[in-house]
Amino acid sequence: MNYRHSYHAGNFADVMKHVLLLQLLTRLNAKDKPYRYVDTHGGAGKYDLSTAEAQKSGEFLNGIHRLVKLDDSIKRNAPEGVRQYLKIVENMRENFGKGAYPGSPWFALEGMREIDRATIFEMQRDVFQQLRHNIFDKRAGLHERDAYEGLLAVIPPKEKRGLVMIDPPYELERKDFPQLVELLVAAYKKWPTGVFAVWYPIKDRAMIERFEKKMFKTGIRRQLICEVCVWPDDTP
C-alpha cells in the first residue's frame, strides 16, 4: 500500500469528513446509553502540517488553513459543527504546535463521552506505531489489522448503538468500490442498528454514480449522500 494520509491531512475533504463525524457523534450523544465508535482506517491519529509531506502537497492550504485564518466574528457565527471542529483543532495546536492537525480517531474521542468506547483499525505497521504513540485513551482499543475482515469480527458491539467510519485509501478504485459495497452489505446484516459513514473521493463521476446505484439496490435503509466539490467534475 502506497497511500500516506500525511500528504492529504487537513485538506477540504478532511474538513468535511471531520465536521460530519462530530455531528454524527453529537446525535448519538443525545441519548443516555453508551455507544461504540469504529474507525476502519485510523491512520496516525495526529498529523504535523509543517512536515515535508504536507508542505509538498499543500492540500491543507485550501482546507483547515483557510478556516483558521477566518475572522473570529465569522467563526463565532459558524454552524455548531464547524465551531466544535475548530475548537478541537485549536486545542491541539495549543498543546502540540501550530502545525498539528487531528486525525479521525482524535476527533472522535474528543466528541465522545466517558461512557462510550472506540475500536480503531490500522493495517500499515509504521502508521499503526504512530497511532499507538498518538492515541493513549483508555476508551480506545487499537488493532493492527485489516479492517475489511476485522470490522465484521467486532460488530455488533455490546453497546448496540454506534457509528462506523469507513475511509479506505481507494488505491484501486475499480476494485475498492465493489469491495466496499460487499463490506457494507455484510456489516449491515450483522448490525442493522449501526450507523455507517463512508468517505469516498470524487475522481470519476461515472464510477461514483455506479457505486451509489449499487448501494441503493442493497436495500440498506435510510441512505444519505453528502458531497462537496470544490472544482468542476472535468477538472484534470
Residues of each region from the PLM?
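Class I S-adenosyl-L-methionine-dependent methyltransferase catalytic core
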Residues: M1-P236
